[in-house]
Amino acid sequence: MQFQLFSFVLIILNCVDYSHCQANRWRRSKRASYGTNPICKGCLSCSKDNGCLRCQPKLFFYLRREGMRQYGECLQSCPPGYYGVRGPDMNRCSRCRIENCDSCFSRDFCIKCKSGFYSHKGQCFEECPEGFAPLDDTMVCVDGCEVGPWSEWGTCSRNNRTCGFKWGLETRTRQIVKKPAKDTIPCPTIAESRRCKMAMRHCPGGTRTTKKKDKKNKKKKKKLLERAQEQHSVVLATDRSSQ
């Protein structure tokens, strides 16, 4: 009887050891399969169908999407279009939501814009904002040439005169308040003119009226001289015929 009981205990112990060994063997084979699967590189836990579920410390969890399928990866750094967010449980890659941004530093700060766009204060622009100038070699916006407000329109004049003509030009100006960051950056125009109608077309006792009168007097004198010459010619012809 004692012998039978002893044999039964040995059988149970062998079964327990065998089950434990089998479990350990299964865990080792599972870890080995994780290690050989490239999807599971750097994972703390991994699924054959979904890839990494948890990452090792200092790595970032990135959810890759290919068509209808998605699976997790553990990366040293996030891919373009994503930025790393460190958390107490696991570091993750979050998608950059800034328009026309290729690489983000944070949710609202872009460090590299897509081709053809200028970077300015963490945002991407097709054209630099007002007051800033583009640098095409680095595709960034820098301080441009800052100018002050326009002055009032000046007096309407022509040939430095404010009368004597129907139309003239009036001009306004503005000053450069801050020079640009680089000498190659042009400043906007600081003076502009436009056509205007003069307040006084005729100058009071002006030269323009006097010139017109002088021309008329010259014409009258010329006509009188021509008439006198004609009359003198007629008189001479009459005297000759009478002789």
From Swiss-Prot:
Recorded hits in SMART domains, A to Z, give: FU, TSP1
Question: Which family does the similarity line name?
Answer: Belongs to the R-spondin family.
Task: Specify the superkingdom.
Answer: Eukaryota
The UniProt GO MF terms for this protein read: BMP receptor binding; heparin binding
Any one Pfam family match given in the protein's UniProt record, by short name: Furin-like_2
Report the residue ranges that make up the TSP type-1 domain in this protein: 144-204
Q: Which residues form the signal peptide?
A: 1-21
Q: Where is this region: Disordered?
A: 202-243
Quaternary structure annotation from Swiss-Prot or TrEMBL: Binds heparin.
Q: List the disulfide bonds.
A: 40-46, 43-52, 55-74, 78-93, 96-104, 101-110, 113-124, 128-141, 145-187, 156-163, 196-203
Keywords for the protein's UniProt record, in alphabetical order: Developmental protein, Disulfide bond, Glycoprotein, Heparin-binding, Secreted, Sensory transduction, Signal, Wnt signaling pathway
Report what the protein is called: R-spondin-2
Where are the compositionally biased (Basic residues) regions? 209-224
What biological process terms from GO does the record include? anal fin development; BMP signaling pathway; caudal fin development; dorsal fin development; dorsal/ventral axis specification; lysosomal protein catabolic process; negative regulation of BMP signaling pathway; pectoral fin development
Provide the residue intervals of the FU repeats: 90-134
Principal place where this protein is found? secreted
Domain-level remarks: The FU repeat is required for activation and stabilization of beta-catenin.
One GO cellular component from the entry?
lysosome
